[in-house]
Amino acid sequence: MSTPARRRLMRDFKRLQEDPPVGVSGAPSENNIMQWNAVIFGPEGTPFEDGTFKLVIEFSEEYPNKPPTVRFLSKMFHPNVYADGSICLDILQNRWSPTYDVSSILTSIQSLLDEPNPNSPANSQAAQLYQENKREYEKRVSAIVEQSWNDS
């Protein structure tokens, strides 16, 4: 069944294939265009460098008028990521716009890795370390980067 949300997701997928952003990839799961699997590679020159972080993106039939739900499947230590992998990012909540597509969502999350918002912490321990003890924060991030290599 073709719906506006499904047609839009097909366009998003086509755009992602034709003009893939650096360091991110995503595709619908095999038998459900409303659920995507994605990967974000840790940005160069950041504590997340060399990490391979898996995510799942779930869309409703109200997409693109409503944002998708995005969660890290890979373990993540970041001020704006909850323990269950949910991401605290304004464009996935109150600043959502139907002009955003899968590509822009993934690149925004990739940027968030290096530029957390400590004023909106989802993980207070990570936020505190990020602000008060960068070296310890980076050590914890290094551990999850190494762990990401073994995630299958």
UniProtKB/Swiss-Prot annotation:
Where are the catalytic residues? C88 (glycyl thioester intermediate)
**EC number(s) from the headed UniProt entry:** 2.3.2.23
Give the main localization category. membrane
Keywords from the named record: ATP-binding, Cell membrane, DNA damage, DNA repair, Membrane, Nucleotide-binding, Nucleus, Transferase, Ubl conjugation pathway
> What is its subcellular localisation?
Cell membrane; Nucleus
The protein's annotated pathway: Protein modification; protein ubiquitination
Q: Write out the catalysed reaction.
A: S-ubiquitinyl-[E1 ubiquitin-activating enzyme]-L-cysteine + [E2 ubiquitin-conjugating enzyme]-L-cysteine = [E1 ubiquitin-activating enzyme]-L-cysteine + S-ubiquitinyl-[E2 ubiquitin-conjugating enzyme]-L-cysteine
Organism superkingdom? Eukaryota
The yes or no answer to whether the keyword Cell membrane is present is: yes
Q: Which GO terms describe its molecular function?
A: ATP binding; ubiquitin conjugating enzyme activity; ubiquitin protein ligase binding; ubiquitin-protein transferase activity
Give an example GO cellular component term for this record.
plasma membrane
Annotated PROSITE patterns: UBC_1, UBC_2
Tell me which Pfam families the record gives.
UQ_con (PF00179)
Q: Which GO terms describe its biological process?
A: apoptotic process; chiasma assembly; chromatin organization; DNA damage response; DNA repair; ectopic germ cell programmed cell death; in utero embryonic development; meiotic telomere clustering
UniProt-listed CDD domains: UBCc_UBE2A_2B
Please state every residue range assigned to the domain named UBC core: 4-150
UniProt-listed PANTHER family: UBIQUITIN-CONJUGATING ENZYME E2 (PTHR24067)
Provide the assembly information.
Interacts with RAD18, UBR2 and WAC.
Q: Tell me its family.
A: Belongs to the ubiquitin-conjugating enzyme family.
Q: What does this protein do?
A: E2 ubiquitin-conjugating enzyme that accepts ubiquitin from the ubiquitin-activating enzyme E1 and transfers it to a E3 ubiquitin-protein ligase. In vitro catalyzes 'Lys-11'-, as well as 'Lys-48'- and 'Lys-63'-linked polyubiquitination. Together with the E3 enzyme BRE1 (RNF20 and/or RNF40), plays a role in transcription regulation by catalyzing the monoubiquitination of histone H2B at 'Lys-120' to form H2BK120ub1.
Q: What is this protein called?
A: Ubiquitin-conjugating enzyme E2 B
- Species for this entry: Homo sapiens
Q: Which gene encodes it?
A: UBE2B
